[in-house]
Swiss-Prot record:
DNA-binding region: 214-235, 262-285
Superkingdom assignment: Bacteria
PANTHER family: ARAC-FAMILY TRANSCRIPTIONAL REGULATOR, RCS-SPECIFIC HTH-TYPE TRANSCRIPTIONAL ACTIVATOR RCLR
Name of the molecule in the record: Uncharacterized HTH-type transcriptional regulator HI_1052
One of the record's GO molecular function terms: sequence-specific DNA binding
HTH araC/xylS-type domain mapped to chain residues: 194-295
InterPro entries: AraC_lig, Homeodomain-like_sf, HTH-like, HTH_AraC, HTH_AraC-typ_CS, RmlC-like_jellyroll, Tscrpt_reg_AraC-type_HTH
Native source organism of the sequence: Haemophilus influenzae (strain ATCC 51907 / DSM 11121 / KW20 / Rd)
Keywords: DNA-binding, Transcription, Transcription regulation
Amino acid sequence: MDYLDKLTHLAQVRGEINIRCEFQGEWQISHQEKDAGKGIFHLIEQGECWLTLNEKQFHLKEGDVFFLPQNQPHSMHYSANKRADIPTKKSHQGLFELHQIGRGTPDLKMFCGNFYYQQDALLTASMPEYLHINLCDTPIHPLVQLFLQEAQKNDAGTKSVVDALSNVLLIYILRHAIQQNLIEQGILFALQDKRLNTALIAILQQPQNDWHIEQLAELATMSRANFIRIFQQHIGMSPGRFLTKVRLQSAAFLLKQSQQSVLAIALEVGYQSEAHFCKVFKNYYQLSPSQYRKSVSL
């Protein structure tokens, strides 16, 4: 499992594409919700529009995806000039909730979806405020075409296919953002630093090890003091705090996805005492491991 797979597992990412928009004429819609545990994205199938985020405007056209990792309030409109919101007519079309404005042939066709993840996940803390990418000339484009084809169907399992494709879409978006140097903070940024990469991957892959600063600094071929300083600058926390987060987020994933006992999970992620593990886990999640397991299985 590589680092991006590991981080998406720790974040417990779950994607869905649930809204299709067909807008005609002069229109504007607003999204006022803010949710640290949910990201939202807009995928332009046909046409063009404008999106305003924190007074900054973006021109979206066919093939664009606009991803807001923390679901920031924003508005979308047919032109660069903002107007009053226009109510949408809502109905259902196959898998999707259909939002319509206007009665003629749509000028804009757009899909909207969500990514859900654990709050305070290392992955989401590394994401920028937004990502605006045109997918037409990228390796992601065939995936988008496959999604558009699947979205027209109503076959058995289509929803599972569409939601699975949304998870793949997130990986491609993040991969593209990393390759284009659009990530400037957190774990994804730090992993691009050759000095820190080896130490970070060692922690991600083996959080159960009894890691010491000296060992990690040696892996990074840096002095102890320099390692701590650079680590803090890149990730915004100490190596010890980072290790604790990886252990606890690994434990949360196992509590949700496995039937292992709390003790077995504690040992697997690096705690030698179930009591100590439960105390640290509850301080972090405000729930005991057993309470957490029940809450995510509802």
